[in-house]
Amino acid sequence: MEFLSPLRYPGGKAKVADFVQCLIKENALLDGTYVEPYVGGGSVALSLLFNEYVRDIYINDKDISIYAFWYSVLHESEALCKLIKDTPINVETWHKLKDIQSNKENVDLLNLGFSTFFLNRTNRSGILKAGVIGGYDQTGNYKIDARFNKDDLIKRIQRIADYADRIHLSN
């Protein structure tokens, strides 16, 4: 399975993307619009868009942290990718970015979006309120960077940004 979303959602909707593609094709709905009211990682929407099953996708998420991430991907992708490239992946950074989630109203969308992304990639099961992979002392079987391949994640974000004119975001 090709991973399209930069976000981790184990047990998410990605596994139904092929089924939704089949539904669209069998019901002659190709080249239409797909609406995702709770986008999360957005794997189904991205699959439909990248494989040209739909012309446009409308994505929404009530959670301002998730919205901020997608806003950053679509409107500040270069700055987001620079943050990903330049930010060290360690527990000290994790604590700083975790604090941002407690003060969402006092931070701009780019920094909130990056915090959301960083925690999603470094927390157990991608859950924003969970603890760090490997534990605070990093003695677990997996370390904080186990799910954080910077080059691959930047490529995913850049690919999505290339479709920004066909992705409509709301909160």
Task: List the model feature ranges, each with a label.
Residues L30-E92:
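Conserved S-adenosyl-L-methionine
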Residues M1-I24, L29, V73-N171:
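SAM-dependent nucleic-acid methyltransferase catalytic core
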